[in-house]
Design a protein with these regions (language model features):
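N-terminal nicking endonuclease/strand-transfer module with a His-rich metal-binding environment
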Residues: 1-214
């Protein structure tokens, strides 16, 4: 999972980029919030002006207030809806989670990798500039933390699903998980299940208790 912070802008040109992708049929607007006065038949210029009006209403001292981010995964590993959940967590942790914060989130279909583009303002609804110190470092830390939590949950779900299958040996159980992309290895009385650098452990006695004897 990669979160890429894209260039800032005075004029919110990221709106033009994403709306052009929509008009080309390779993107769609997944979420719009904080734009209560915008008619659904908006134009890109109206969206850009709404961002500019919002920003300079609360803080006119920031030269490049656009925050533009892309979140992408490998292939179809995550659906756009799952990426949207990750985006919400990311925005919260990076300081953009206020319910009145204007945000546009687009799903893109123009590459082999599912990805989202997020456009918002660096100005919070109370007028302060959202912290950008060590922004790229914090961004990577946040996405790693979110993905660590998510990978643990996915691995746990994969284990539960694998336990629903019929198997007669621990090796057969390992094969079920390996077919889903997990690396499995035994260590003492545990089975270690690894993917994308994240490892969960399960006691082998729990697996053995589910073994089906023919």
């Amino acid at each position: 999972m990669i979160a890429t912070i894209l260039p800032s802008s005075t004029t919110f040109h990221a709106v033009d980029y994403n709306e052009r992708k929509v008009s080309e049929g390779v993107a769609e607007l997944l979420e719009m919030k904080g734009f209560d006065l915008i008619d659904q038949n908006y134009t890109p210029e109206e969206l850009k002006q709404a961002f500019i009006d919002y920003t300079y209403q609360y803080n006119d001292r920031i030269q490049k207030p656009q925050f533009h981010l892309a979140i992408s995964c490998r292939g179809n590993e995550y659906t756009h809806e799952q990426l949207l959940e990750i985006a919400h967590k990311y925005l919260d942790e990076m300081g953009y989670g206020d319910p009145n914060q204007p945000v546009l989130i687009y799903a893109h279909h123009d590459t082999d990798n599912n990805h989202l583009h997020i456009v918002t303002s660096r100005i919070a609804p109370d007028g302060h500039k959202i912290d950008h110190n060590q922004e790229r470092i914090r961004s990577q830390e946040v996405i790693n933390r979110i993905m660590g939590e998510n990978q643990e949950q996915r691995a746990s779900d994969a284990v539960k699903k694998a336990l629903d299958y019929r198997f007669s040996t621990v090796n057969q159980f390992k094969s079920i998980l390996e077919s889903s992309g997990y690396e499995c290895y035994e260590k003492d009385d545990r089975l270690c299940i690894k993917r994308d650098g994240h490892v969960i452990n399960i006691a082998k006695c729990l697996i053995q208790s589910d073994i089906t004897f023919e």
